[in-house]
């Protein structure tokens, strides 16, 4: 496994993070550029997204925590300062969804998903450095979510609200999503930062929130017929249950496992491990003979989205390494290695750095979507490298 760990460190440092340090830093307006397109062209006046900037903060904080290189701390601090100065809403709490290239608020809605990623980034910075201000911001954002976005009546987290935390008509994260008031994706990216915050701020209040989120996954989001996680719901948790998202399934399998491990409750861990193994089995329906994992299955009409998106491969690799590490199942190690071989051959851009967005159904590289941008960040692939470097498997 040492060879795999060495490969991951090389990819992390010389293919991913180096790209962000040399290509994406915005020296004129601060922080990082909002977009570098699929042909590596910088768009200096592109809007800057909260999710992208919070993920940059997380990635460089985590890289510094593990590798202790000063340039990673410098980049993490740059991202922290930018989110602090331009995205935090000092009047109403939470963070803005986007700012323009000069840092002026653009879309001021409160997307719970984005606030979750800000918690993830600030808590990781605190974890890596011991910085009290970063921890205080993460805690404050946690309280913002619990105060404004948690629906106690229906037990779930509201997808989005206005800047002032009032109801909003269009709650979608992106044009690709259904306009549901409850989504699996947002709940996944709340339990993920809450778990990370718990590592540095172990309080009964936060533990209660995390345990409740696990219950929401097992009682509301999990389709107990298929063991896929369903994606879109209304306030009362009614949903079409018509899409199977393999990448989200395998990502959830290891993130929920991580949550149970961090909580340290053996009874709960045993319960969650049974479930996450079945979720991972369901996700494996997306595996293909070339080692990759395809994107989605739409049960209406039995159609498949066969593109191989970069992030799905990352989560596929972590998820199967997690299964191998804890349950010693050799076939899961082989799945992870096979998927990595696919990534190295098709998605990783060895010439220009970073990874392509996807390989399309016809086998060509997707260069229409970004190398760095609103939804393309050094998060999934950096995390994959760091997980494989840090884990004992």
Regions from the PLM with identified roles:
Residues 1-393:
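Glycan-recognition and catalytic cores of secretory/periplasmic carbohydrate-active enzymes
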């Amino acid at each position: 496994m040492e060879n795999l760990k060495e490969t991951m460190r090389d990819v992390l440092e010389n293919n991913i993070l180096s790209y962000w340090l040399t290509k994406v830093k915005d020296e004129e307006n601060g922080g990082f550029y909002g977009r570098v397109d699929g042909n590596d062209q910088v768009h200096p006046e592109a809007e800057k997204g909260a999710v992208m900037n919070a993920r940059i903060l997380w990635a460089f904080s985590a890289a510094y925590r593990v590798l202790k290189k000063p340039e990673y701390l410098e980049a993490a601090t740059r991202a922290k300062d930018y989110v602090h100065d331009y995205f935090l809403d000092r009047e109403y709490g939470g963070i803005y969804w986007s700012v323009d290239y000069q840092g002026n608020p653009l879309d001021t809605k409160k997307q719970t998903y984005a606030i979750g990623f800000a918690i993830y980034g600030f808590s990781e910075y605190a974890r890596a450095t011991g910085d009290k201000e970063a921890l205080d911001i993460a805690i404050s954002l946690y309280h913002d979510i619990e105060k404004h976005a948690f629906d106690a009546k229906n037990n779930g987290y509201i997808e989005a609200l206005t800047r002032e935390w009032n109801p909003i008509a269009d709650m979608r994260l992106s044009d690709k999503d259904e306009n549901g008031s409850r989504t699996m994706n947002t709940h996944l990216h709340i339990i993920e930062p809450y778990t990370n915050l718990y590592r540095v701020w172990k309080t009964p209040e936060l533990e209660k929130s995390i345990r409740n989120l696990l219950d929401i996954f097992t009682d509301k989001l999990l389709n107990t017929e298929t063991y896929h996680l369903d994606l879109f719901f209304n306030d009362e948790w009614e949903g079409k249950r018509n899409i199977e998202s393999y990448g989200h399934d395998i990502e959830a399998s290891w993130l929920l496992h991580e949550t149970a491990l961090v909580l340290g409750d053996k009874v709960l861990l045993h319960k969650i491990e049974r479930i996450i193994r079945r979720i991972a089995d369901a996700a494996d329906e997306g595996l293909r003979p070339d080692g990759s994992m395809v994107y989605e299955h739409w049960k209406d009409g039995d159609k498949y989205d066969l593109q191989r998106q970069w992030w799905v491969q990352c989560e596929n690799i972590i998820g199967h390494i997690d299964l191998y590490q804890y349950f010693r199942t050799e076939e899961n190690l082989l799945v992870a290695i096979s998927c990595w071989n696919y990534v190295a051959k098709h998605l990783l851009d060895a010439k220009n750095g970073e990874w392509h967005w996807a390989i399309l159904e016809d086998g060509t590289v997707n260069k229409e979507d970004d190398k760095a941008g609103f939804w393309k960040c050094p998060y999934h692939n950096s995390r994959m490298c760091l997980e494989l470097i840090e884990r004992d498997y």
